[in-house]
């Protein structure tokens, strides 16, 4: 089974899937369009969240970073006048250093991800969507800004006029992603932000065509017609669709099975169920529902 994931929503589903499927049967391809270099190291927020979730290290209060991490280095940098865009924990930073060292030595992001996966003892396969650089750029009245500047530094306050993926036209799917598309019969599009998390993955050359003969399942990130979290509604409006499940499908494209919340207004063919995943039990129940659909 191939899972397409961002850094929110889908990791909660993953913690359920690994309890009902052999983890070795799961391949996760993760959005990298929100990556950025901070203090000399490459931070891959969505990849890190997926890796830490699969390693049972994720801070489930915030759904980013490592549970119980300290922030000594981040605090000391602030004290000496170094401003970091993200709050980076000390253990979290160690993996950023490993990733960056691999890349500086000529390796790819996929190579670095594999080293981290092995170090954490993760049995599932995890790949970046691409080894090429892609950046989500948000257009606002204040000008264009990287997603992390918009969401973290400016707390998502500026008006969103547009969203684009810089570098997407030249980027290729990672070799691990290509192989997974050849090998897997089922693709699950996780409940991550459809615009900034899933759309970059689907926009890579050849991905939609390669999914055409797969069994496809999409889990809506909306609770009724509202996102569970984050700025998804504003991004959806910025790309010209309504922030409802019909809008989600217009971004994702047609799928074989579309799972929505019980309160969704979606008029098309879908499976209505409880899509909240506030607990491991809820995540596991939804994972079982997906397995039932794909046989």
Predicted features by range, described:
Residues 200-209:
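Charged helix-capping and loop-helix junction motifs
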Residues 27-31, 215-222, 257-262:
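Short internal beta-strands
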Residues 30-165:
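Electropositive, gly/pro-rich neighborhoods at or near active sites that engage anionic ligands
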Residues 33-34, 214-229, 275:
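Short, flexible loop segments at boundaries between secondary-structure elements
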Residues 161-180:
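Active-site glycine-rich loop that binds ribose-phosphate moieties when present
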Residues 229-295:
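C-terminal functional extensions of proteins
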Residues 1-49:
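Gly/lys/ser-thr-rich phosphate-binding loops in alpha/beta enzymes
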Residues 19-24, 208-214, 252-253:
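Short, conserved loop/helix-junction motifs that constitute active-site signature segments
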């Amino acid at each position: 089974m191939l899972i397409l994931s961002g850094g929110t929503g889908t990791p909660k589903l993953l913690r359920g899937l690994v309890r009902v499927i052999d983890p070795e049967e799961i391949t996760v391809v993760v959005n990298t369009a929100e990556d950025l270099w901070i203090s000399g190291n490459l931070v891959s927020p969505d990849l890190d969240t997926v890796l830490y979730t699969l390693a049972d290290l994720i801070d489930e209060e915030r759904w980013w970073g490592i549970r119980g991490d300290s922030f000594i280095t981040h605090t000391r940098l602030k004290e000496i006048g170094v401003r970091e865009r993200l709050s980076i924990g000390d253990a979290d930073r160690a993996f950023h250093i490993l990733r960056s060292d691999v890349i500086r030595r000529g390796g790819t992001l996929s190579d670095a991800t594999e080293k981290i996966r092995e170090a954490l003892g993760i049995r599932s396969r995890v790949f970046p969507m691409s080894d090429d650089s892609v950046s989500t750029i948000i257009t606002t009245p204040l000008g264009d800004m990287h997603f992390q500047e918009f969401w973290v530094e400016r707390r998502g306050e500026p008006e969103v006029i547009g969203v684009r993926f810089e570098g997407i036209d030249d980027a290729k799917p990672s070799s691990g992603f290509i192989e997974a598309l050849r090998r897997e019969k089922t693709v699950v599009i996780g409940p991550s932000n459809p615009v900034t998390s899933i759309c970059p993955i689907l926009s890579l050359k050849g991905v939609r065509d390669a999914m055409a003969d797969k069994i496809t399942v999409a889990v809506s990130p909306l609770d009724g017609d509202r996102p569970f979290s984050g700025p998804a509604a504003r991004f959806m409006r910025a790309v010209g669709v309504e922030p409802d499940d019909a809008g989600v499908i217009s971004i994702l494209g047609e799928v074989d099975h579309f799972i929505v919340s019980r309160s969704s207004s979606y008029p098309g063919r879908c499976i209505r169920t409880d899509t909240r995943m506030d607990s491991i039990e809820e995540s596991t129940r939804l994972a079982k529902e997906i397995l039932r659909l794909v046989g």
